[in-house]
UniProtKB/Swiss-Prot annotation:
Signal peptide: none annotated. It comes from Cupriavidus metallidurans (strain ATCC 43123 / DSM 2839 / NBRC 102507 / CH34). PROSITE patterns: RIBOSOMAL_L14. GO terms for cellular component: cytosolic large ribosomal subunit. Keywords: Ribonucleoprotein, Ribosomal protein, RNA-binding, rRNA-binding. One of its GO terms (biological process) is translation. Part of the 50S ribosomal subunit. Forms a cluster with proteins L3 and L19. In the 70S ribosome, L14 and L19 interact and together make contacts with the 16S rRNA in bridges B5 and B8. Binds to 23S rRNA. Forms part of two intersubunit bridges in the 70S ribosome. This is Large ribosomal subunit protein uL14. It comes from the Bacteria. Belongs to the universal ribosomal protein uL14 family. The lineage of its organism: Bacteria, Pseudomonadati, Pseudomonadota, Betaproteobacteria, Burkholderiales. One of its GO terms (molecular function) is structural constituent of ribosome.
Length: 122
C-alpha cells in the first residue's frame, strides 16, 4: 500500500533512483495505491546524466508493493520493496527498459508496454 509521503524505488532506466509519492490519483479522498494504480511523484534521487532531474514531478504506476497483491485463487504475491515506473502526461512509460519483476495485474490495455518490457511477469 502506497500513500502520500511513501518513498519508492524506480524500476526503469529514466535515471531516477528514488521517488516520493505526493498524491494518489483517483478521487479526492483516495488514500492508498496498490499495484497498477497511478500516483503523482517527485524525484528525490537521480543519476547525474539521466533523463529526469531531482525535483521533477511525474505520473507513475506502482509495479511492486511489499504489502502484496491477493489473487482470485487465494495466493498472495509480495515483494521486498515498493517500486514504480515513471510515466509521461499521456501515461506512457518514459524509460525504455524495466528492471525486476512485475505482476500480472498490470496486463491491462493501459500498461501492456510495461508488461512487454519487463524481464519477468509474476
Amino acid at each position: 500500500m502506497i500513500q502520500t509521503e511513501s518513498r519508492l524505488e524506480v524500476a526503469d532506466n529514466t535515471g531516477a533512483r528514488e521517488v516520493l509519492c505526493i498524491k494518489v490519483l483517483g478521487g479526492s479522498k483516495r488514500r492508498y495505491a496498490s499495484v497498477g494504480d497511478i500516483i503523482k511523484v517527485t524525484v528525490k534521487d537521480a543519476a547525474p546524466r539521466g533523463r529526469v532531474k531531482k525535483g521533477d514531478i511525474y505520473n507513475a504506476v506502482v509495479v511492486r508493493t511489499a504489502k502484496g497483491v491477493r489473487r482470485a485463487d487465494g495466493s498472495l504475491v509480495k515483494f521486498d520493496g515498493n517500486a514504480a515506473v515513471l510515466l509521461n502526461n499521456k501515461l506512457e512509460p518514459i524509460g525504455t527498459r524495466i528492471f525486476g519483476p512485475v505482476t500480472r495485474e498490470l496486463r491491462t490495455e493501459r500498461f501492456m508496454k510495461i508488461v512487454s518490457l519487463a524481464p519477468e511477469v509474476l
